[in-house]
Amino acid sequence: MKSVKVFAPATIGNIGPGFDVLGLAVDGLGDFVEAREIPGHKLVIEDIFNADHDISTNPDKNTAAIAANEILRMFNIRKGIGLIITKGLPSGSGLGGSASSAAAGAVAINELCNGGLSNDQLIQAAMKGEAYVSGGYFADNIAPSILGGATLTQSINPLKVLKLGSIDELIIILITPKIQILTKDSRDVLPKNISRSAFIENMANTASITAAFCNNDYSLLKDNLRDLAIEPYRSKFIPGFDKVKIAALDSGADGMAISGSGPTVFAITNSKKKAKIIEREMVHEFNNHGIECNMLITVPSKSGTRIIKAN
């Protein structure tokens, strides 16, 4: 029987000031979903590997399976399908773990059904999966995970997503403190209103970062990686955030921000030598607050969700 294995990359939601709008796929991290035809007419989750906590095997409560079933609905097909999910991303890390699983699930079933769906349809199906855990429809993680590179979500309904490109010089230092922040909780803390000055600066910074990825311009990114609207509220969930940011900048980083809803934070540089120093100092500061971390020095992933193996 036919089978396919798919990889979907991790993502940085918001890229600083671009709340719910900007997102970036990163290399070296992500989730795998293997889908295979089985007897019967239902989709089932056969196994889940490397999960850091209990992830439901109920297809109605699993992001990959929800996205997969949505693809089947789009094709108007009922068939037996078994899913095997291998997690490469911790839950509640701010690296788009639920989005990655949903993206992989959507693309895997599209391939199993001989393809034909557009990127927009794949994004819509994956958003339905992620909505189960995030509480709403957002594409700032889903879109870059499927498309690769940086993306801009203009609207959700109707769906309008632009692929912006990448920045060749960009080196990303990802630090994930070993604490969990749920997306729903991090949204509840956000203010209903922000100051005019914060709004204006975030608009300018978001526009500049958009231009940076469109023009492969590292200097434009580093000069505008500042978030005055959301970071002051979400950073309260991350112990030692302010000191970690100071440590990053003092050790040569050109900017630091929260990845998505956190707790992962990311710093940027265009120097491999500096990247190792920045990583060391950020981890050291988290350790000073009694927090262990996972860390990775990486680059943007120009490729999005992709087929690893097909039989």
What are these regions (language model features)?
Residues G80, A139, I258-P263:
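Short Gly/Ser/Thr- and Asp/Glu-enriched loop/turn motifs at secondary-structure junctions
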Residues S118-D250, K272-N311:
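ATP-dependent small-molecule kinase catalytic core of the GHMP/sugar-kinase superfamily
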Residues F266-N270:
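Short hydrophobic/aromatic beta-strand micro-patches
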Residues M1-G13, K79-G88, A126-G135, P239-G252:
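Short, hydrophobic/aliphatic alpha-helical segments
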Residues A99-G116:
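Active-site-proximal alpha-helical scaffold in enzymes
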Residues M1-S93, E111-L117, G148, S301-S303, ...:
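ATP-binding N-lobe of GHMP and related small-molecule kinases
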Residues D60-T63, G97, S101-A102, N205:
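Catalytic-loop motifs flanking and including active-site residues across diverse enzymes
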Residues G255-S259, I297:
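Short beta-strand
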